[in-house]
Amino acid sequence: MGVVAKNFPIPDLHRVRRILLSVSDKTGVVAFAQALHATYSVELISTGGTAKTLIAAGLPVKDVSEVTGFPEIMDGRVKTLHPLIHGALLGIREDPSHREAMEKNSIHGIDLLVVNLYPFEETIQSGADGKTILENIDIGGPAMIRAAAKNYAYTGVVTAINDYDSILAELKQHNGCLSLSMRHQLAMRAYAHTAAYDTAIAAWFARDLKIETPSWQSFSGHLESVMRYGENPHQQAAFYRNNEKRFGVATAKLLQGKALSYNNLNDTDAAFELVAEFDPQKTAAVALIKHANPCGVAEGENLKDAYLKALMCDNVSAFGGIVALNQTLDEECAEEIVKIFTEVIIAPDATMAAREIIAKKKNLRLLITGGIPNPRCGGLLAKTLAGGILVQSRDNVVIDDLKLQVVTKRTPTQDEMRDLQFAFRVAKHVKSNAIVYAKNSATVGIGAGQMSRIDSAKIAASKAAESARRAGLTETLTKGSVVASDAFFPFADGLLAAAAAGATAVIQPGGSMRDEEVITAADEQGLAMVFTGIRHFRH
């Protein structure tokens, strides 16, 4: 059994008379301390660099060493880890035994703790060596934060600079007191803060030790936005941002339009990750997404060309979708995009002329990321299950890095090979089972999310035929196309369906028990076929 709690009344309002400040980021701390001291005559206690900053501003500050009677030692590693500090943070003021211990040991309660921690994650991101990173693991700060948060009945704890103003407003409202509600909220934020800090430390140790599956795995993020609802109106939703420095929806700036919904964020992320497969230094590329699946993807001489080719694939599904671009949105492409209803445009940047065109559509959201994510970069993906979390590394295999194997009698032509590689890039981002028909560096038919591969092949061909009819063409778009499959063909039927649709070449991972049967069928149909050796399931 754990510790048995004592039942003492918790005051609704508690006066702030004594405050301890120990901050790594000094932003705003002088003005905050000045307001507290000038308005409420609060006694100020501080440590090291924070004390020097406050003293330099003319504030009367008592160094923590004066309180403890013990100097900072070991290069500042030990300064607040002392009973006179932790007793002041943890003492239950209504408990006679606690009061007796405090009086006997000259412990004076601390009513407000202001701490922000050593910049651990920033130190990692700076490229510092392991020893420097280790030194930037805060010990005393988290210990004090946890102590103060546990004793929120009497002690407030501030861990974020943007809480300074709300604390001053609270004190003004209650004549120098903090309400129980505020102290309780601050405690919750404090424990979330230290949990996130420890999560980052544990993750760094795991990376340093090259442990891919640590015995405990934690994830953290700070609240970025609360949405009106989730995938459906009856579901609650929020977006939390972590510290991964990857260009995308999390780092993007919303230049115009209303706040993004849960589905907007999910679809836009899928769109931008797909278009990032295409190097902006080599080609212009556009991806059109609906329900996290592509309904059109293309490369072109410029973004307008790529957009129109992508739209040709399935202009019905593209209505109300997401448009992702791998280059700066220009005027010509913007003029085409606004011709149909679009939810979101995401691009590395946009010219002023393009922004002016988009601005005419008030509800059209324009996101600017500042760059393109590197598809080769790793990272973790997580999915919650009932009672658990599935974790895997990001699918960061790029077809350019693969050794492709021609397994048929006929070798793909240069144009076919270009289109095969294009189609396989797209198939990586289509929900399984995925079949992608492509021609001239553009998708012409996409079959997604079917339980059988042959159904995906038939649906993709059918949609291509529909698009051709809408465009007034006399022959289907899949004639003379190539086809990509995200996984192997378990039987020859899917490949035969592709051949019947007019495809001339196939790219797939290979690895089926019936590979020879499928290769024989390809040869009989005069198809060229390439194995990649890599599967791209996506669920």
From Swiss-Prot:
Which keywords describe this protein according to UniProt? Hydrolase, Multifunctional enzyme, Purine biosynthesis, Transferase
For this protein, the record's Gene3D superfamilies field holds: 3.40.140.20, Methylglyoxal synthase-like domain
Q: Write down the chemical reaction(s) this protein catalyses.
A: (6R)-10-formyltetrahydrofolate + 5-amino-1-(5-phospho-beta-D-ribosyl)imidazole-4-carboxamide = 5-formamido-1-(5-phospho-D-ribosyl)imidazole-4-carboxamide + (6S)-5,6,7,8-tetrahydrofolate; IMP + H2O = 5-formamido-1-(5-phospho-D-ribosyl)imidazole-4-carboxamide
BP GO terms, sorted: 'de novo' IMP biosynthetic process
Q: What is its EC number?
A: 2.1.2.3, 3.5.4.10
The leader peptide range reads none
Query: What positions does the domain MGS-like occupy?
Result: 8-159
Keyword Membrane in record: no
Q: Name one Pfam family in it.
A: AICARFT_IMPCHas
Q: Which GO terms describe its molecular function?
A: IMP cyclohydrolase activity; phosphoribosylaminoimidazolecarboxamide formyltransferase activity
Q: Does the keyword Hydrolase apply?
A: yes
Q: In which pathway does it act?
A: Purine metabolism; IMP biosynthesis via de novo pathway; 5-formamido-1-(5-phospho-D-ribosyl)imidazole-4-carboxamide from 5-amino-1-(5-phospho-D-ribosyl)imidazole-4-carboxamide (10-formyl THF route): step 1/1; Purine metabolism; IMP biosynthesis via de novo pathway; IMP from 5-formamido-1-(5-phospho-D-ribosyl)imidazole-4-carboxamide: step 1/1
**What PROSITE patterns does this protein's entry cite?**
MGS (PS51855)
Record SUPFAM superfamilies: Cytidine deaminase-like (SSF53927), Methylglyoxal synthase-like (SSF52335)
Per the record, its GO cellular-component terms are:
cytosol
The record's annotation in InterPro entries points to:
AICAR_Tfase_dup_dom_sf, Cytidine_deaminase-like, MGS-like_dom, MGS-like_dom_sf, PurH-like
Looking up NCBIfam families in the UniProt record yields: PRK00881.1, purH
Domain comment in the entry: The IMP cyclohydrolase activity resides in the N-terminal region.
- Family in the record: Belongs to the PurH family.
Write the protein's name: Bifunctional purine biosynthesis protein PurH
List the taxonomic lineage: Bacteria, Pseudomonadati, Pseudomonadota, Alphaproteobacteria, Hyphomicrobiales
